[in-house]
């Protein structure tokens, strides 16, 4: 829902109100079959041994080995309700301000019975998030502008990160952690934009992020050795600089573009 506001400049000022919902159901099931030798002393020599010669229907009926079936499964239900309000106002030809406030209600439920019944239970994450944001834009002239942004966001654990199912791969094993907490992120950035033409851009951004309860993959010291996920500290910080360039290498008039191509552009981001 958008309400237009009157300003004395470009009349881009407005207020937006809205709601979004995200509803996700993730389910996982892994079936494992274990073939166990019943008479180990009578097991044939490994010289010239063939699995098909031993593990077959006749030997199963004769009791030479048995088959054990195990099913590991988990489900993750994620419901997120979001309501937001956002206001944009252009005070002068140079100054534009955008203010926003978003409310999220997060409800995540994990049910699991994994690792041959060794890990069975459930876990719930229910949280309210109030997420403010502020964006300021100052037009130095027609081609140069400065932007300042500040916001709060959050990062939720993925389904595989909060289920204790142990995945056995060729090169590594990994297991989720049902006790993971979401991370809170406080973001700040300052950006300079230069537009040599309407389709070209040179941009330089300095950013800073403060993270509460950051989530990371770790290696667990154990006899088997596996990877898992943890809130590795109370807080963490990330800072850096980003450069983006979009440049037209050549532009041809439409009358000269017989093959339909009238522009070739180059882009760089790093």
Q: How does the language model describe each region?
A:
Residues 207-210, 227-270:
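Gram-negative outer-membrane beta-barrel transporters
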Residues 32-36, 114-116, 163-166, 220-221:
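Short secondary-structure boundary/capping segments
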Residues 7, 23-31, 105-113, 118, ...:
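Gram-negative outer-membrane beta-barrel proteins
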Residues 62, 107, 142-187, 203-229:
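Surface-exposed extracellular loop regions of Gram-negative outer-membrane beta-barrel proteins
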Residues 1, 79-85, 130-136, 146, ...:
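Hydrophobic, lipid-facing positions within transmembrane beta-strands of outer-membrane proteins
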């Amino acid at each position: 829902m958008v309400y237009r506001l009157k300003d004395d400049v470009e009349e881009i000022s407005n207020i937006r109100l809205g709601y979004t919902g995200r509803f996700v159901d993730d389910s996982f099931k892994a079936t494992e079959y274990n073939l166990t030798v019943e008479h180990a002393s009578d097991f044939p020599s490994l010289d010239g041994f063939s699995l098909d010669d031993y593990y077959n229907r006749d030997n199963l009926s004769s009791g030479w080995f048995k088959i054990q079936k195990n099913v590991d499964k988990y489900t993750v239900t994620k419901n997120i309700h979001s309501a937001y309000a956002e206001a944009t106002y252009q005070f002068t030809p140079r100054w534009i301000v955008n203010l926003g406030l978003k409310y999220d209600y997060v409800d995540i439920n994990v049910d699991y019975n994994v690792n041959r019944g060794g890990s069975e239970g459930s876990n719930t994450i229910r949280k309210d998030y109030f997420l403010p944001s502020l964006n300021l834009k100052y037009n130095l002239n027609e081609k140069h502008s400065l932007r300042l942004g500040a916001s709060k966001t959050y990062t939720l654990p993925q389904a595989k990160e909060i289920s204790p199912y142990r995945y056995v791969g060729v090169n590594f094993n990994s297991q989720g952690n049902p006790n993971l907490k979401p991370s809170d992120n406080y973001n700040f950035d300052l950006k300079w934009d230069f537009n040599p033409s309407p389709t070209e851009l040179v941009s330089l951004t300095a950013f800073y992020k403060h993270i509460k309860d950051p989530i990371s993959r770790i290696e667990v010291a154990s006899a088997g050795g596996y990877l898992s996920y943890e809130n590795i500290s109370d807080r963490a910080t990330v800072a850096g600089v980003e450069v983006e360039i979009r440049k037209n290498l050549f532009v041809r008039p439409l009358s000269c573009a017989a093959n339909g191509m009238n522009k070739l552009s180059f882009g760089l981001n790093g």
